[in-house]
């Protein structure tokens, strides 16, 4: 899609609702409003959506919001959150195996794991608003 990385669009968060609100406030006050905000987890995305509504933005008509994790928050908020589902159970099992191996004196430095994630499309995302 030829999207250029713009560091001004990256905001620090702390994986909670409040830091999602703070980051959204900064992004929503920019002169060139982004068409979408992707948060590092669903709690932050919920904060983004809340801040958007508090400032008169409609989601997804004015701005799309996407989270990560597919936590219960994603399907319980309004509009339901588009998010990325990752295989938490598989990841936790593998992390546990590696921890046990390391505790037993094994070398885990060369261990790799890859997981398939799934985009769960719900109502918080849509095509960008036509400018002009």
Across the structure, where does each feature detected by a protein language model lie?
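Bacterial carbohydrate/catabolite-sensing allosteric modules
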Residues: 1-132
């Amino acid at each position: 899609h030829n999207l250029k990385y713009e560091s001004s669009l990256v905001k620090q968060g702390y994986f909670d609702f409040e830091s999602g609100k703070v980051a959204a406030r900064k992004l929503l006050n920019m002169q060139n409003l982004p068409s979408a905000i992707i948060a590092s987890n669903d709690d932050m995305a919920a904060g983004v959506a809340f801040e958007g509504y508090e400032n008169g933005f409609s989601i997804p008509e004015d701005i799309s919001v996407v989270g990560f994790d597919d936590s219960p928050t994603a399907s319980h908020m309004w509009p339901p959150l588009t998010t990325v589902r990752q295989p938490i159970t598989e990841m936790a099992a593998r992390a546990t195996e590696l921890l046990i191996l390391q505790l037993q004196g094994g070398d885990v430095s060369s261990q790799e794991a890859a997981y398939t994630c799934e985009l769960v499309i719900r109502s918080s995302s849509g095509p960008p608003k036509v400018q002009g």
